[in-house]
Amino acid sequence: MLNINTALRRLHESRKQIKLGLVGAGQMGKGIVTQVSQMKGMSVSIIANRSIDKAVQAFLLAGVDREDILVANTLSEAEQAMKGGKYVLTEDIELVTKVAPVDVVIEATGVTEIGAQTALKAIYNGKHIVMLNVETDATVGPLLKKMADGAGIVYTGSAGDEPGAIKELYDFADAVGFDVIAVGKGKNNPLDRDATPDTLRDQA
């Protein structure tokens, strides 16, 4: 993450962008769209979501003009719209993983099966993956990482959410010589040392 601001600024100055495709326009997805809209050198260009209205709202909250937002149902429609500088919405996840201008697919649905399917399609189509879907990552993340490595693409979690934040803390503690014996839950949930799957089932 060091010097990412400089790298993105250089991309912007050379009139280039990292094109992002987002799957899932819920709370985390909307946050991604809004945050990226404030950054140089990156752009969320296409969103796949079950509800097109939610995806529209994500772009509108980020300051995109309504007339610049188009719905696409086919690969050719999506690519033509993006080449014309439009922001694309679709209900078809596969479009996000196939559309040529997209460099990176961000998975933010929170649904295990959808996350796995999205990552597999991204790998098959040579797209890098940022997995915000901790449910998928905890279930099949190591397998997806191995497949992505074999395909020569990046599979990664994200900074900011609890799993990424815990990993950053672990890496720092390990680097400065601490013997880390355990990592655990972040501050958002109460610590229950006696928790079992049965006692947490209703909360989950």
Regions found by a protein language model. Give the residues of each.
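Predominant activation on well-ordered alpha-helical scaffold segments within soluble catalytic domains
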Residues: 33, 56, 120, 142-146, ...
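Residue-level "edge-of-site" marker
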Residues: 50, 72, 135, 161, ...
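General beta-strand structural signal in soluble alpha/beta enzymes
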Residues: 89-91, 106-107, 131-132, 155-158, ...
